[in-house]
């Protein structure tokens, strides 16, 4: 694929004038004679890259003509003869994130030669790592009698997690410079208030330093012991942090809808479980379907932020099993299904339902008006719609309407709150689905944020089995925390490396790998897990596998080693693939006592392949020819090459044939 000057500038970090001076060329077919032989073959470029130019570091410099990095050997005030398109962008992407360490290895070059086409590609392996502190969660170490308070602990954890999943989020953005006093002192992440005070000063006084507060806050969320409850919802916070104005409105509306639905089914479930409840005051009862646009009234009544204290207080009124079903049903919107119910009374939560209105059943009326009502709701949002509104279908003919009424007469006895609640959920789900379609592509990648459903369903299964204990809760908390970090990082890499069209068009992602190493307090490896994926959807497929894998492993906590007959079933539950690491490591992870784990190291490894572009400027080609000839003569005499930036005069071009090829280089081929 042809590379434009602008694309090269974006992906190399150079300015457009620099690339215009460089004159990039991708296909050197019939242009090979313009370059020294070492500059056109994979072996020759490897030799030049390693011993002369040091491309792995040179590509990160400003290489404009006359820039400081170009003044002496081997560039002599000109850009290099090649640019590795996308390499600098990859390094910048990894550097912009909160990794503790980054390594780039196996920088290699490959040739593609066929009649009419001769190109060279570069490839590299990037390994970015950071460690999160998952050590002893205070709830499990400060309790003398854990079993007596197990239900309260479980309810508290669920309440905090649900608040994080359903509470409305507001982005927190800082601009300008933040200065903090006390150079060299340890800066704690929670010292943001002190930073705000120091930032008021007009100038920077002695003893102050500029502090990357965003980096400090990210480090804060790497430590479960310190951030405690604030760890929940980290992935969603960063998602909305990166959203534009339109996406913020849509994402906030989606969360309001999920919150309203959760509050609605909780109130309905609580009402069923308390038959002696007092009737609701008329002012709080919604009469349906008289309110044709009932969604607005629904949101107004139910979208108050989910409160942790009120959720904890539900312990006596709503069994944990039903609470979990309600959570799964709300968080999985617009997918999933409504929570099962066996109550057939005409209640519908705080809605007052009338069996028939104007000769038509309530639920059927809502169903018929659903599409038009949803369109009106979206049209009232303060955003410009990206998709054209599809007009609602025309009303059915009188004959069909009469037949429908006859069917409703027959099915009148079947009209129940089960159908009504299903219609409420179907309407909310369809509305959320439509709002997600209105999101920009960068904000629509919800596949990275659906991991919560897997964990809630795992706890639901444990609750059904009566297997909630300290071990399962500890692992549930720890793996949920790990999943938050994994989702956040994979989403970031997806946005920068796959969702950025210019990079995705020219640079191929060959392999994406996540390595999870659990370590004890001495730093020893307790177990290690590996997940690999390739292709266009590598990041989302990795997240789906990791989420399912960790959630399934929660159910094995505290059970010790797996028996032979259990291993095959467990491998099926985690959807084991051959590229998921050693089976013994997986079994060790399932059987380990999680109190031994002090930290979890997450490594994100990427193998990418991108294009090499050649210069068409004669002056750069001539300098390269003279540099290669001089370096080849030094190598032939077993002398050391000058260090990059050495004050070596530009050597003259020796007379006669070109110097011999570097080791491993192939001669030119003519087709």
Swiss-Prot record:
The identity of this protein, by name, is: Preterminal protein
Q: What does this protein do?
A: Protein covalently bound to the viral DNA that acts as a primer for viral genomic replication by DNA strand displacement. Assembles on the viral origin of replication in an initiation complex with viral polymerase, DBP, host NFIA and host POU2F1/OCT1. During initiation, the polymerase covalently couples the first dCTP with Ser-580 of pTP. The terminal protein stimulates the template activity over 20 fold compared to protein-free templates. Neo-synthesized viral genomes are linked to two preterminal proteins, one for each 5' end.
- UniProt signal peptide: none
How is this protein annotated for GO cellular component? Answer: host cell nuclear matrix; host cell nucleus
Give the Gene Ontology MF terms in alphabetical order: DNA binding; double-stranded DNA binding; single-stranded DNA binding
Which InterPro entries does this entry report, sorted A to Z? Adeno_preterminal
Q: Give the encoding gene's name.
A: PTP
Which Gene Ontology BP terms does the record give?
Answer: DNA replication; viral DNA genome replication; viral DNA strand displacement replication
Q: Where is this site: Cleavage?
A: 175-176, 349-350
Q: Compositionally biased, Acidic residues: which spans? A: 397-411
* Annotated source species: Human adenovirus C serotype 5 (HAdV-5)
Q: Tell me the impact of changing residue 578 to R.
A: Decreased pTP initiation activity to 7% of wild-type activity. No effect on DNA binding
Q: Where is the composition biased (Pro residues)?
A: 649-665
Query: Which residue ranges does the UniProt annotation give for the motif Nuclear localization signal?
Result: 380-389
Documented effect of changing residue 582 to R? Complete loss of pTP initiation activity. No effect on DNA binding
Give its localization. Host nucleus matrix
Modifications made to the protein after synthesis: Preterminal protein is used to replicate viral genome, upon genomic encapsidation it is processed first into iTP and finally into TP by adenovirus protease.
Q: Which residues carry this modification: O-(5'-phospho-DNA)-serine?
A: 580
Give residue numbers for the site Priming of strand displacement replication by covalently linking the first nucleotide of the new DNA chain: 580
Quaternary state and interactors: Heterodimer with the polymerase; this heterodimer binds to bp 9 to 18 of the genome. Interacts with host POU2F1; POU2F1 binds to the auxiliary sequences in the inverted terminal repeats and tethers the pTP-POL heterodimer to the origin DNA thereby participating in the assembly of the pre-initiation complex (POL-TP-DBP-NFIA-POU2F1).
Q: Which UniProt keywords apply?
A: Covalent protein-DNA linkage, DNA replication, DNA-binding, Host nucleus, Phosphoprotein, Viral DNA replication
- Family statement: Belongs to the adenoviridae terminal protein family.
Q: Where is this region: Disordered?
A: 386-411, 645-671
